[in-house]
Amino acid sequence: MDVHAQTTSPSARRPRRLVTLGGLTLAGALALAACSSTSSSPATTKASSSPSTTGAASATAKILTPPSSTVALTETGSTLLYPLFNLWGPVYSKQYPNITLTTAGTGSGTGISQAAAGAIDIGASDAYLSSSQVSAHPGLLNIPLAISAQMINYNLPGVSGHLKLDPTVIARIYEGKITAWNDAAIAKLNPGVTLPATRIVPLHRIDGSCDTFLFSQYLSKGDPADWGANNFGTSISFPPISSALGATGNGGMVSECAKTVGCIAYIGISFEAQTQKNHLGEAMVANGSGNYVLPDNATIDAEAAGFTKSTPANGAISMIYGKTAAQGYPIINYEYAIVNAKQSSSTTAQAIRAFLSWAINAAGGNAPSFLSQVGFRPLPPSVVSQSQAQLQSVQ
């Protein structure tokens, strides 16, 4: 694929079948802070079809066996992970009818706090634990489950293909320094494209979210001199701009952008089906090598590969705006299970170890039949092994 092409249609670019869950909100506690989010209804899963493992690479870690007794596992947290857990649960329960999984999308911050309190078995988070959280809860683990990405979308009728945007231009937009789509800075990145004089409407999250963390960290790493090297977080004070709008959750970002001509927004990739349904454009964004890329299987994998060797044993690492992958997509992250190493019973501990060992395995939950539905990518084999090693601490 020519990453500089301007005429590829969004629907033709990636043949992925994505889960559409309207109204889900993404919130998280990323390295510096915890977030809150609107709750999604709990779902208890019991039955579905078995996964296809065609084309899945063999994982180095084995899938563990759950206990023979009945165990009801509970999961809550990241609404970006919520669709994936809802795919995983029924299949796992079909294979092991004595194990059930009740899921809820309440935001990563809730997932972390509930796991820390021992109120649930598995917390789902779009981010690793902060140093303060680790200090407060030394037995809490963040276990990588899969890899996700964030899109930059816009509502610009009549403009086909994918506009190119870099972190400097995006930062200027959110600072109110670039106010029209035909601004010279945008035109320079998109020669030959007829840009309208439409007013730009920067859309941002008004709830604390990992999307805001990822987005603002991309700007801080790509434009440190102007945006600010430390101007990132789950909740930041965006510059006051008269045209700017706020929305809650990824679902809110999609719907608000869809009804606002001129909008630009940052949206989690598991909502790609909704962005396409609402005819939102998707930008090719500049990576650390200066190339413009879209988030697809190849570019997400390429970016992740640049961080594989540096991923620590506990999986806590930022993968934003790397400089080693020429065709890597620059806004990606690990998705995490937050689990207490010390469980209330050995039976529960065994069930957690078994389920999560299945979830991270290419012959189980990391199979394309699951991940492709939400736009996620599988863990590299070495990270699978690291996650498996962390699971052994759950007792």
Question: Where do the model's predicted regions map?
Answer:
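Bacterial N-terminal signal peptides that target proteins for export
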Residues: 4-25
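Generic alpha-helix initiation/capping and coil-helix boundary signal
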Residues: 20-24, 40, 380
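C-terminal motif of bacterial Sec signal peptides marking the signal peptidase cleavage site
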Residues: 29-34
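Flexible loop/hinge segments at secondary-structure junctions
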Residues: 2-4, 13, 36-38, 44-395
